[in-house]
Curated annotation (Swiss-Prot):
Lineage: Archaea, Methanobacteriati, Methanobacteriota, Stenosarchaea group, Halobacteria
Annotated organism of origin: Haloarcula marismortui (strain ATCC 43049 / DSM 3752 / JCM 8966 / VKM B-1809) (Halobacterium marismortui)
Protein role: Binds to the 23S rRNA. Forms part of the polypeptide exit tunnel.
GO molecular function: rRNA binding; structural constituent of ribosome
Protein name: Large ribosomal subunit protein eL39
Subunit details: Part of the 50S ribosomal subunit. Interacts weakly with protein L23.
Record's keyword annotation contains Ribonucleoprotein: yes
Recorded family membership: Belongs to the eukaryotic ribosomal protein eL39 family.
UniProt record, GO biological process: translation
Amino acid sequence: MGKKSKATKKRLAKLDNQNSRVPAWVMLKTDREVQRNHKRRHWRRNDTDE
């Protein structure tokens, strides 16, 4: 549990941003063809390799 470098923080911020659901407007636009974000990651179960 040491200090995080700026690069590590940036990568973690990107992973946090990617870990969101598919927006509702995308589901509407694609007529529910896109329903799930298959890259969702649980903070405890899945590793980020970071």
